[in-house]
């Protein structure tokens, strides 16, 4: 058995897709376990850039299975749009597998998401308004419609009628918007299900069988640890569990099947939307990093908030997600800065702390304590091994690793797959 879990160790957008694409070359199965079409990932493949939201990045690897696990919430028209887009670009999608237990996002989830966000006024969470939270809300309320229900016309009809009756009460009486018609959803979504039916199966069995047969399984995360509904900056979080533990529930594998957890991070920090962000840069350095790193959301297009690398948040991510090693991206973006900073701890009400507070009010009062290191001007985009990097870049990476309490596995110095320095292949950590 050999398994690797990829988790975003910051606030999402860390470049998980690139590492998934790289590691999937050796994997037999690539699995996604949570999130929905709120999570965008961009992959450079064969000279083209592909922006995906639902389809696992492993779809680009030939002769592999790309699995959407039960923890993923699926918007059928959005998924079909992606599949057609891939086919139009010559990508073979025959390896796709979709869990029959995955939950479905409907138009009423999207409308409810928008209504709830607007009702929050100045306290908006900053959701993508794709209906992800309301879909998970129905799931835990035990009224959700799953993929297996969508394929059974009578079951789908019964559940849709019941859900719409409840949701339309909310729309008309609480939010004062027009109700959603049953006829606008039923036939079209049933047809979506029929088109997806060929890919629907018991994915937990597929993944467990692969592990039991000593095949390599790669679990692809979405979002990031700091957006985890339990361990992140609640309530400014996503509705699912991006931590490594979410793989177990979101795929249907036991924790003893998880061998290695790769924490994906940037050489700096970013987040989209509202919420605490202790190392945020609002000056010209932040603007420079944003423009050089093209820091705009894959899904929303919103400019990302930018900050220095936060080792306090990283250590929190390591603890709650069991990170084995780090895969650091976008080191090249820091090229040209005279100095680079790493947050080593916080000051809370004058007292130095090295933990990440749960309280939002405490986080707002936290001041980052920085360690400053000299920067570098040399072009690093062609570096093939660690020793090719300027000494100042090497020292920066070593300090990030030390403060994060995690060894470096890879360093990315450019967008292309080949622009990756392998310090130690993450698959090797599975056999330590």
Swiss-Prot record:
IMP binds at residues 13-16, 38-41, 128, 142, 223, 238, 302. Belongs to the adenylosuccinate synthetase family. Mg(2+) binds at residues 13, 40. SMART domains: Adenylsucc_synt. The active site is at residues 13, 41. It comes from Limosilactobacillus reuteri (strain DSM 20016) (Lactobacillus reuteri). Binds 1 Mg(2+) ion per subunit. The keyword Nucleotide-binding applies. One of its GO terms (cellular component) is cytoplasm. Its cofactor is Mg(2+). InterPro entries: Adenylosuccin_syn_GTP-bd, Adenylosuccin_syn_Lys_AS, Adenylosuccinate_synth_dom1, Adenylosuccinate_synth_dom2, Adenylosuccinate_synth_dom3, Adenylosuccinate_synthetase, P-loop_NTPase. Homodimer. The lineage of its organism: Bacteria, Bacillati, Bacillota, Bacilli, Lactobacillales. GO terms for molecular function: adenylosuccinate synthase activity; GTP binding; magnesium ion binding. This is Adenylosuccinate synthetase. Substrate binds at residues 298-304. Pathway: Purine metabolism; AMP biosynthesis via de novo pathway; AMP from IMP: step 1/2.
